[in-house]
Amino acid sequence: MRIASFNVENMFDRAKALNGANWAEGRPALEAHKELNTLFEKPTYSAANKAKMLSLLQANGLSKSDEGPLLRLRKIRGNFIKRPRVGPPEIVATGRADWIGWIELKTEAVNEVATQNTARVIAAVNADILAVVEAEDRTTLRLFNEQVVGETIFNAVQASPYRHVMVVDGNDDRGIDVGLLSREGLPIVSIRSHVDDADANGVIFSRDCAEYEVRLPSGQSLWVLVNHFKSKGYGAASANDAKRLRQAKRVREIYDEHLAAGEDWVVVLGDLNDIPGNQPLAPLLQNGSTLRDIAQHPNYRDSDNRPGTHGNCTASGKLDYILLSPVLFGKVSAAGIERRGMWGGVNGTLWPHFDEVTKAEEAASDHAALWAELDL
C-alpha cells in the first residue's frame, strides 16, 4: 500500500496574494487582510483604530473602491466607510455593531497547465491513500479528482480517480485546507477535526489537524493525521515559531493518545513548514517521540540527491513530511519523492521535470510529493 502527501497549492482558484513569484510579493496584503479583520471585530472603534483602518485600506487600493488589486471589502449591512467625491474617506461606523462585513482575499484561476500538472504528479505517485494540503474545499477536490485526475494520461495509462474524497473546512479562510483521498476498498470510516483545540494562548491550529480513520481490507484501522502548520511567510518569526511549536505539541499529544489506546498504526503527514533540527518540530522529531521520518528510512530513494521538498529543495526547504509510528516504519518497503511537477531554480534546471512544465507558471506546485510503500 502506498501513502503519499502533496501540497497542491490549490487546484483551480488561489488567492492572488498567495500566487506571486515569492512570499514577499503578497505579504503586505496578507498582513493587511488579517489586521483589518481583527480591527473590524472591535466593539468600539477608537480614533487610532479608524486611522489604522484608513491607512491599510489606502495601502491596498481600497480607499476609493471596495475592489483592490488583491483584497476586497465585502459590506453586507450597515454603513462602514464614507467616500466623498471631494475630501478624504472617513470611517463612519463606531464599532462592530454598526455594520456587517469583512476583508476577503481576491482569487484568480490557477494556470490550466499547472492544474493538469498537479494531476500528473498525483498520477505519477499513484498512492492508495493521498493526503492533500491547500485544497480549496471538498467540492473542488471532488471535481478535480473526477474531471482532471480521472482524465489524465500518464505513461500511456489512464489515471484512476479516487473513490473517497474528504476535506473538512479548517480555520484558514484563504481556501487552503487539508484533505484525504483513498482508493476503493479503503473507506474513511471516521473523521475528527481539531479546529477548536485551544491552549492558554488560544486556538492552536492555523488550519486543522484532521484525523482520518481509514479501514484496511484486513479490518485494521489506519489513523492518518493530516497537517499544515503555520507558515514562515508573514508575521514575526518568533510568533510563527511559537505557533508551530504549539501545533507540534498538540499533534504529539494526539499521536500519544492513539498509542495509549493500542492504536499503533498512525501516520502524521503534511506540510509542517519547518526543518528537522528546529525547535518547533522537536515534539514530533525529538523529545522522546517515536515517530520516524520516512526520509530517514534505508529504503528511501532520492535520485536528485537534494534534502528539501520545497522551492529549490535545499536543506532549508525540507518542509513536508511523512512520519510513521514504529510499527508502520518497520513495514516500509520503499519510499521516495516526486519533484517532476516542480520548476527547480530560475531556469528550471535543478532536476528533471515533466515535458509539460515549460515555465515556472506551469509548475504543479512549489512542493514535491512524498510517498511511502508499506507492506500492510
Question: Which sequence ranges carry the predicted segments?
Answer:
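Active-site metal-binding loops of divalent metal-dependent hydrolases
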Residues: V8, A135, F229, D271-L272, ...
